Design a protein with these regions (language model features):
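Bacterial N-terminal signal peptides that target proteins for export
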Residues: 1-12
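Bacterial N-terminal signal peptides
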Residues: 10-20
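Surface-exposed, short loops/turns at beta-strand junctions within beta-sandwich domains
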Residues: 773-774
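Glycoside hydrolase catalytic-domain context in secreted enzymes
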Residues: 25-767, 777-788, 795, 799
């Protein structure tokens, strides 16, 4: 479609026609030298009720809708929309819509254009759960800076990110979009994301307005089912689910998205305590709140409002300023006229929206250079960072020698760790085992390995690599593992690529028994797809090493993608079991948006890598790890369950009144995870010395310190993690371990480094029931460890 020709309001068309064309009014709100609040008040005073409601309304323009742009122009001219969800990659459409808003409405208020820019725009990075496993907020800030630059060059000025929700139940599909399960670590990533998106000034070129979502408690949906209700008590709410949002507000985020859930029976979009008392009253948030998709109208479905008008009044009064997609706010005119809804409530919501529009700079810079996008996306430095992010986000879960002996029994959870209960005996420090020369771990791939079989449906699959919520990401930009592997091995080696099976498999036609007759349900497709065991077995038998690329489909992650069983899909498990029996070393690379409970794979494979959904540089980043060009340093930010039945599972649980193992285990399995929070292997090994606490002195806080030594034979990065436990809390029980600090430490072979953490009130405190930060006197345990559930606690008493 070619851009429409804009009508001229003067000249050849005549003064008569000019008088019919709306012209933006000159006024103080156009003066960029004035304080933002003065501009807001001047503009607000000029607006009609209909224009005000229009600013509180967001609509969608998606791919394909550009065929009828006049429909959008007509709506914009009425002033009945203030923002759009924009999915069109061509800036000409966005500029045309913006020009209509500015030149063909009475007040010329520009539009906000938002989209879900979650883990990259065109340059797609690992999903947020993967990025979090880098334990590097600076890297996340860099990635979001690139995403913002690319998005702004397309015409977006607002992203619905970052997600601040905790990931405590891997059945929930949106675990993929989170930064993990820990409120402290998530807070760091949320703040880093806000800085990456908005910079120091969201009006600067290449910046977009950030949006903290989903406010709040959305991820605690009962049963891990998306959109379900939540049951979060206030004390837990304040100390676990709310801190990442608070960190985002403190970092300067300009918008917040209310969530789909209803906590304690009150839908978030209509929760006055959440959106007004807490967000604005306690935290001082000055931006605006937008609902999630049709979230205001869903207040009726929850049963919290009798009809759409009631939902609109309840949500707007609660502090939900903008309505995404549903149209209940358009029904408010009569209720404003008869005084049911005070105009002051509407004015306050509009005031917040206008303030963000002024701060974002779109009054001064409303348009986008149509040529900027092509010059900005997929820049070499952006792609290079995407590759580095892959290598740093993958987590090496297992890496053992290949002994060619069949495994017996089931794998023990958490290999290489010592389960810890600070109330019981003190465990020994944890050290990553170092293989003997005769039992070299299978990774990195040895130089004498020339014949490699890459088996599995993810090996040469492009779309699966970029995952869910990809904004403008394209499969054509992806370099697959197969491509990168063949490039790395070159002519001197042999790489056999065998799909083996489909990702999802296929569902056979169902058979039912009716009156003694078997009836074939023809509405279900017959068995189809790929399942070629002979080819896979043959390739494995002819190779020195097998790499199996397995996982879950990207469409089974993200929104509305809950799972009852977090296992491999289709016939992948059968494929793995068959190949594992061939008698060759097997390295499994898992592609997923969540941890998967795969006990037989962890038992039989020599090595396992969690690759997540790695982005466009999936192949090169993984090859860097497989061949040892990069020593893995990723650490889990989510507990990896041994079985779906353990969910929800998270490291910072409570001690219970009966902490002895006999009272907290299941009858049929251990409560211990397969891998704990903070876990991850490297190609070297580290040891931790005995920790000690240095008392406070001379105005300096107390400190805890230890010495970490690289006991391996190559340089590596360790993530030293500080954990704390408070033994007595008058406000309520506290978790038996909480992360309160970490340091990434790079060490050469044999090198030692002293690691020190300050023991401040920020480390020891928590949010009290009154919403204020509280630090109690009394006994604490502190320890520095490579992961949760391990380490050597040191007693500390705060006077």
């Amino acid at each position: 479609m070619t851009p429409r020709s804009f009508r001229l309001c003067a000249g050849a068309l005549g003064l008569a026609l000019a008088s019919l064309c709306p012209v933006a009014q000159a006024g103080d709100y156009h003066d960029a030298s004035l304080p933002v609040d003065e501009r807001v008040e001047d503009l607000l005073a000029r607006m009609t009720v209909d224009e005000k409601i229009g600013q509180l309304t967001q609509r969608l323009i998606d791919v394909g809708m550009e065929k009828d742009m006049e429909k959008f122009f007509s709506v914009i001219r009425t002033g009945s929309v203030g923002a759009y969800i924009l999915m069109l990659e061509d800036a000409q459409y966005r500029n045309a819509m913006q020009k209509t808003a500015i030149e063909e409405t009475r007040l010329g208020i520009p539009l906000l254009f938002g989209a879900d820019v979650i883990h990259g725009h065109r340059t797609v990075f690992p999903l947020p759960l993967g990025l979090a496993c880098t334990w590097d907020p600076d890297l996340v800030e860099q990635a979001q800076t690139i995403a913002a630059r690319e998005a702004r060059s397309m015409g977006l000025n607002w992203t619905f990110a970052p997600m601040c929700d905790l990931a405590r139940d891997s059945r929930w599909g949106r675990v993929a979009e989170t930064f993990g399960e820990d409120p402290y670590l998530n807070s760091l990533y949320v703040a880093a994301s806000v800085r990456g998106f908005q910079g120091t000034n969201p009006a600067d070129p290449g910046r977009v307005v950030a949006c903290l979502k989903h406010f709040a408690g959305y991820s605690a949906s009962v049963g891990g089912r998306d959109y379900n209700h939540t049951e979060i008590p206030p004390f837990i709410f304040r100390n676990f689910h709310l801190p990442p949002f608070h960190a985002g507000v403190n970092a300067g985020a300009l918008t917040v998205m209310s969530s789909f859930n209803a906590n304690d029976g009150i839908p978030a979009a209509a929760d006055h305590w959440l959106l007004t008392d807490l967000l604005r009253g306690e935290w001082g948030f000055k931006g605006f709140v937008v609902s999630d998709w049709e979230g205001v109208q869903e207040v009726v479905d929850w049963g919290y409002a009798p009809d759409d008008v009631g939902a609109a009044i309840a949500s707007l009064t609660a502090g939900n300023d903008m309505e995404m997609m549903s149209k209940t706010f358009t029904l408010l005119g009569p209720k404003i006229a008869d005084g049911t809804l005070p105009i002051s409530v509407v004015d306050e919501a509009v005031r917040r929206v206008l303030r963000v529009k002024f701060l974002s700079g779109i009054f001064e810079q409303p348009y986008t250079d149509p040529e900027a996008y092509a010059k900005t996306i997929l820049a070499p430095e952006s792609v290079a960072l995407a590759r580095a992010a892959v290598a740093r986000s993958v987590v090496l879960l297992k890496n053992e020698p290949f002994l060619n002996t069949p495994p017996t029994g089931t794998p023990s959870p958490t290999p290489g760790t010592v389960p810890q209960n600070p109330s019981a005996s003190t465990p020994a420090p944890t050290a990553t085992p170092k293989p003997t020369p005769k039992q070299r771990a299978i990774l990195p791939i040895a130089s004498d390995v020339k014949r490699i079989a890459l088996i599995g449906p993810f090996g040469d699959e492009k779309r699966e690599m970029i995952g869910c919520w990809i904004s403008q990401g394209k499969a054509k930009d992806v370099v697959t593992l197969a491509t990168a592997l063949k490039s790395r091995v070159g002519a001197d080696g042999d790489v056999k690529i065998v799909q083996g099976c489909d990702i999802n498999g296929s569902q056979p036609r169902t058979k039912t028994l009716t009156d003694g007759t078997v009836v074939l349900d023809k509405s279900v497709a017959p068995p189809m797809g790929v399942f070629d065991l002979p080819a896979a077995v043959r390739a494995a038998g002819e190779s020195d090493l097998v790499i199996m690329a397995l996982g879950e489909p990207w469409s089974w992650t993200g929104e509305n993608a809950s799972r009852a069983r977090i296992t491999l899909t289709g016939r992948q498990q059968e494929l793995f079991d068959t190949i594992a029996a061939v008698g060759k070393p097997v390295v499994v690379v898992l592609f997923s948006g969540r941890p998967l409970a795969l006990p037989s794979i962890f038992a039989k494979a020599s090595a396992v890598i969690a690759a997540w959904q790695p982005g466009i540089q999936a192949g090169p980043g993984l090859v860097d790890i497989l061949f040892g060009d990069v020593n893995p340093s990723g650490r889990l930010t989510i507990t990896w369950p041994a079985d779906t039945g353990q969910l929800p599972i998270y490291y910072n649980r409570y001690n219970t009144g009966r902490p002895d193992k006999g009272f907290i285990d299941y009858r049929d399995m251990s409560r211990e995870p397969m891998f704990p929070f903070g876990y991850g292997l490297t190609y070297t090994s580290f040891s931790y010395g005995k920790a000690e606490v240095i008392p406070a002195a001379n105005g300096k806080p107390a400190q805890i310190r230890t010495t970490i030594t690289n006991t391996g034979d190559r340089e590596g990065t360790e993530v030293a993690q500080l954990y704390v436990r408070q033994f007595f809390c008058p406000e309520g029980a506290r978790p038996y371990q909480e992360l309160r600090g970490f340091q990434r430490i790079k060490l050469r072979p044999g090198e030692k480094k002293e690691v020190t953490f300050d023991v401040t009130d920020e480390v020891l405190g928590y949010v009290g029931r009154d919403g204020k930060w509280r630090v109690d006197a009394g006994k604490f345990s502190l320890w520095i460890a490579p992961q949760a559930n391990s380490g050597d606690p040191v007693s500390f008493t705060r006077p």
